[in-house]
């Protein structure tokens, strides 16, 4: 099983940026926790962080075709990353959108996600543990292989 974890703009600043909102855990610490969980269950986990939408799209185009699951925290691209949204829509793997903070308890502009319509599900407000929950959910789809976004939800026509 292959899972991609995509971290959008400014997530490289976790641990320093507004710890009262995003927590004190760094991105490197989050990635290490995720890698440890993945290794324990025999999952290949590839992570990427970029402040540039095009770099995230390049990663998806290179690695996403045979992915069994995608976890994405798009950061600010949540609200305007249409090219990223289109890149995700091309792929067939289940997509879980993760946000460290509860975006619906914050400023109104954060309430709209252009990513959500192509995501299988969304986890918000649970801090770094939201990534672990996403992995656990994807593990429940193990063996279904790429092309199972609708099957994972039981909504395939």
Curated annotation (Swiss-Prot):
Gene3D superfamilies, sorted: Dehydroquinase, class II
The EC number(s) this enzyme carries: 4.2.1.10
PROSITE patterns, per the entry: DEHYDROQUINASE_II (PS01029)
Keyword Ligase: no
Highest taxon, organism lineage: Bacteria
InterPro entries linked: DHquinase_II, DHquinase_II_CS, DHquinase_II_sf
Active site annotation, chain numbering: 22, 99
Keyword match Iron-sulfur: no
Site (Transition state stabilizer): 17
Molecular-function annotations in GO: 3-dehydroquinate dehydratase activity
Residues that bind substrate: 73, 79, 86, 100-101, 110
Disulfide bonding pattern of the chain: none
Metabolic or biological pathway: Metabolic intermediate biosynthesis; chorismate biosynthesis; chorismate from D-erythrose 4-phosphate and phosphoenolpyruvate: step 3/7
Reaction(s) catalysed (UniProt annotation): 3-dehydroquinate = 3-dehydroshikimate + H2O
Keyword annotations of the record: Amino-acid biosynthesis, Aromatic amino acid biosynthesis, Lyase
Homology family: Belongs to the type-II 3-dehydroquinase family.
General function of this protein: Catalyzes a trans-dehydration via an enolate intermediate.
Protein name (record): 3-dehydroquinate dehydratase
Species annotation: Roseiflexus castenholzii (strain DSM 13941 / HLO8)
Lineage: Bacteria, Bacillati, Chloroflexota, Chloroflexia, Chloroflexales
């Amino acid at each position: 099983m292959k899972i991609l974890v995509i971290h959008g703009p400014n997530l490289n600043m976790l641990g320093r940026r507004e710890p009262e909102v995003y927590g004190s855990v760094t991105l490197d610490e989050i990635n290490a926790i995720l890698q440890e969980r993945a290794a324990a269950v025999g999952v290949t986990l590839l992570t990427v962080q970029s402040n540039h939408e095009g770099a995230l799209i390049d990663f998806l185009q290179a690695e996403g075709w045979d992915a069994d699951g995608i976890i994405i925290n798009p950061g600010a691209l949540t609200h305007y990353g249409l090219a990223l949204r289109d890149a995700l829509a091309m792929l067939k793997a289940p997509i879980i959108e993760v946000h460290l903070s509860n975006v619906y308890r914050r400023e109104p502009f954060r309430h709209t996600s252009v990513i959500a319509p192509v995501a299988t599900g969304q986890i918000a407000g649970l801090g770094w543990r939201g990534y672990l929950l996403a992995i656990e959910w994807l593990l429940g789809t193990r063996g279904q292989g790429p092309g199972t976004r609708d099957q994972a939800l039981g909504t395939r026509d």
